[in-house]
């Protein structure tokens, strides 16, 4: 498998477009040291792949957040990214995890997709989580927001240190409606034959050739995907300002230093008395 790449492809004679995502390094970095249950790791892997696919599909410059939130064992799971495919993600648990489907993990809730473009107005789409799988929830989003037939297939391997998350995406092109429906049905039937182990182990060209060898997919230059947290000492200092100097000094006096941990990458930022004074000077 070629690591951490998004491949977009079209078919010369079919009104359908597709994407294939295969992620290893960025996924392992995202879940490392968080001690998530395997079901939560898998959910975050699927959500990571979905966010990469959405970022490429919706064609914007800026930032995106895809969040699942509800009343289930997983209070929320969120992936933050941008059009350069810089991604980070986190999940928060509020009770013991016993199931593995979206319904069992999130419970009654919503999927919230927020796009903050570099230029233009912020967009937010909210979709009730009415399906068992994340792929069905994403498909429902496209049916609701863009009225475009869409299908997704996800595969994850949560092996410690060797985790992988992959996804396959098909969507009709808004050209000739009847032809698009027929083309989509043809490619959907072919795509249904994909096995999880093929998505997880084979390189993109092999996967696409096996699936669509008679339809000649035209594959574009791949886009790399990377884990990028974005936390910095400077951003942490800005957050501390809101607490107030005296409260921070009192905390230092009691504990010797202030330790702020990034929720995403778990990096610790330490501040002593002089650091606190420097923040307010």
Swiss-Prot record:
Any single GO BP term: protein refolding
Keywords: Chaperone, Cytoplasm, Disulfide bond, Redox-active center, Zinc
Single GO MF annotation: protein folding chaperone
Keyword Protease: no
Residue pairs linked by disulfide bridges in the UniProt entry: 229-231, 262-265
PTM section of the record: Under oxidizing conditions two disulfide bonds are formed involving the reactive cysteines. Under reducing conditions zinc is bound to the reactive cysteines and the protein is inactive.
Record has Disulfide bond as a keyword: yes
SUPFAM superfamilies, A to Z: Hsp33 domain, HSP33 redox switch-like
Domain of life from the UniProt record: Bacteria
Subcellular location: Cytoplasm
Pfam families in the cross-refs: HSP33 (PF01430)
GO cellular component, one term: cytoplasm
Biological role: Redox regulated molecular chaperone. Protects both thermally unfolding and oxidatively damaged proteins from irreversible aggregation. Plays an important role in the bacterial defense system toward oxidative stress.
Family: Belongs to the HSP33 family.
HAMAP family the UniProt entry points to: HslO
Protein name: 33 kDa chaperonin
Species assigned in the record: Pseudoalteromonas translucida (strain TAC 125)
């Amino acid at each position: 498998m070629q690591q951490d790449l998004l491949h977009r492809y079209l078919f010369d004679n079919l009104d359908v477009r597709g994407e294939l995502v295969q992620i290893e390094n960025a996924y392992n970095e995202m879940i490392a040291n968080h001690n998530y249950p395997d079901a939560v790791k898998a959910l975050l892997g699927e959500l990571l792949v979905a966010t990469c696919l959405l970022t490429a599909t919706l064609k914007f410059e800026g930032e995106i957040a895809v969040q699942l939130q509800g009343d289930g064992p997983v209070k929320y799971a969120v992936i933050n990214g941008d059009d350069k495919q810089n991604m980070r993600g986190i999940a928060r648990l509020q009770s013991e995890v016993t199931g593995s489907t979206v319904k069992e993990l999130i419970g009654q809730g919503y999927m919230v997709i927020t796009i903050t473009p570099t230029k233009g107005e912020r967009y937010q789409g909210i979709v009730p989580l009415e399906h068992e799988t994340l792929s069905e929830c994403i498909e429902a989003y496209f049916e609701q927001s863009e009225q475009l037939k869409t299908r997704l297939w996800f595969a994850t391997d949560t092996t410690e240190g060797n985790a992988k998350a992959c996804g396959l995406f098909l969507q009709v092109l808004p050209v000739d409606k009847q032809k698009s429906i027929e083309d989509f049905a043809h490619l959907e039937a072919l795509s249904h034959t994909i096995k999880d182990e093929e998505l997880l182990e084979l390189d993109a060209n092999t996967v696409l050739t096996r699936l669509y060898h008679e339809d000649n997919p035209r594959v574009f230059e791949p886009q790399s995907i990377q884990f990028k947290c974005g936390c910095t000492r400077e951003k942490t200092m800005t957050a501390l300002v809101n607490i107030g100097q005296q409260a921070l000094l009192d905390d230092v006096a009691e504990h010797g230093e202030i330790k702020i941990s990034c929720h995403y990458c778990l990096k610790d930022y330490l501040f002593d008395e002089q650091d606190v004074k420097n923040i307010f000077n």
